[in-house]
C-alpha cells in the first residue's frame, strides 16, 4: 500500500535559526517597507491570496555536521482568504532529535505601523498523527486580526535532524542533534512554493575541509561560492517564482520545482557502506523467529517460493503502525526481535523483519533506501522516504522485495514502484540505481463476460475478472477490505461504474491471502 511520503522514513533535514525575543513594536527597516510596497497587490498576482515577499535561510554547519539554520520569511496578504490562512502559524518539530524556537514575529500593517507579537504565546501541542505515533509536536501561534495589505514577518531557529534507520550512538547535551552520519551535511532546497515568491535565498557556511557538491534542477537558480577564512560560503537565490500549480496526477513537487541538492558526502557507495554499518546489528534472530521460519518453509525447496512465502507472511502479519520505542525512535531500525514480538512497525521495521527472516532461511539480504513517489538525484543527499529489501543472488545480482506494499498483492515487488530509485546498504558500497519499468500488460485486467438482454431491458450474465500486478491487488483489496459476509456487496460496488443498480447474485472469488495464483472473481 502506498504510504504518505513522510512515513517512517529516510529523510534527513538539518535546520537551525537565530535567537531573539519579541519586544516592543519598532519601525521596520526601510528595505522591508520598500519590499512590501513593491510586492504589489492582488492585481499583480491574479488568483492568489498570499505572496511570499522574502524567504531567507542561513545555515551554519559545525565540524560534527550539526547545522544551525536561521530562517526569516515575509508574507503579504492579498485577499481576505489570505488573511484567514495566515491567522494561525504552525511550527513542527520532534523533541527527540530537533528543536525549534520562534524568535521574532512582526505584523507590518498597510498604514506603515508595526505590531510585535510575543512568541511566548505560542501553544506547544502534540502533532496530529496517523499510522506513525512517535511523539512529534507542534507550536501554534495565533496572530492578531490581519487585513489585506498587511505583511507578516517571522524569524525562527531550528537545529537537529529527522531520519529513519539509524542507530543512536551519541551522548552529551547537544549530541542528540548531531546527524547520525557524523561529520556530514546535506539538504534539498526547493525554490518554488504553493504561493508566488518574490525573492528566496539560501546561504550555507561550512568548514573549509567540508566542501559541498551540488546541482541545480528543474529551473534557473543562481549560485555562488566564496572563500572566507576557515569557511566556505555558498549562496543560491531565485527571483519572481510563480506559485506551483498542481494538476491531477501531477508528479511530486520535488520532480518539477526548481531545487538545489547538496551534500558533503562523496558518492552513493560511501552512503551505502554507512547505511550497512549502522543497521547490521539489528538483524539478529531469536528462537521464536527461527521456529517460525522453519514452520513456514517446511517442505519448500524452490528459492523463489521461499522468498515469496516469507515476504507475504511479513506483509500480512506485521501491521503498518509506528509505535515509539523511546529514545532513538524515528531514526533507528527496530531490531527484528522487537518487531516480531510487537507485530507492528513502519516500513523500515517491516523491511528489517523480512531481512531478519530471510537471513535465517539462508539468504544474503540487505536493507535498502528508496524513494516512493519521486526521483532521487545523483548528488548523494538524503532523498529517501521508504525502506525495502534486497536479496543477493549467486551471480551477484539483486532481487528486490517490498513487504510494506505487498499486503494483498501477489507480486513480490509492487508494479506501482516502477523506475523507483534505490541504494542498497552493503559492506562494499552500492551506487544509486533504479527498478525497471513495468509494461501495462503486467497489470492487465482480463474480463470475460457472457450476458443476455431480456424484454424488460435488464442485462443478466456472468463475468470473470482476472487481475495481474496492480489489477491483482485491486481485486484482492476489494475482497479483503470488506467483511466476509459483505463480499458480494463489495464486488457490486466495484462494478458500479458499469451502470446503476448492479446486483451480484452469486460470487466465487479467490481467497485474498492465496498468493499461489492471480486474483480472480
Question: Predicted regions: what is each one?
Answer:
Residues 1-5:
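Positively charged n-region of N-terminal signal peptides that target proteins for export
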Residues 7-19:
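Bacterial N-terminal signal peptides
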Residues 7, 344, 460:
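Short glycine-rich loop/turn motifs that provide flexible caps or phosphate-binding loops at active sites
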Residues 267-342:
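Secondary-structure boundary elements
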Residues 302, 306, 346-350, 459:
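Short, contiguous, pocket-lining structural segments
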Residues 23-265, 289, 338-341, 349-520:
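Beta-strand-rich, non-transmembrane domain signature
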Residues 14-15, 300, 354:
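Hydrophobic alpha-helical elements and their junctions with loops/disorder across both membrane
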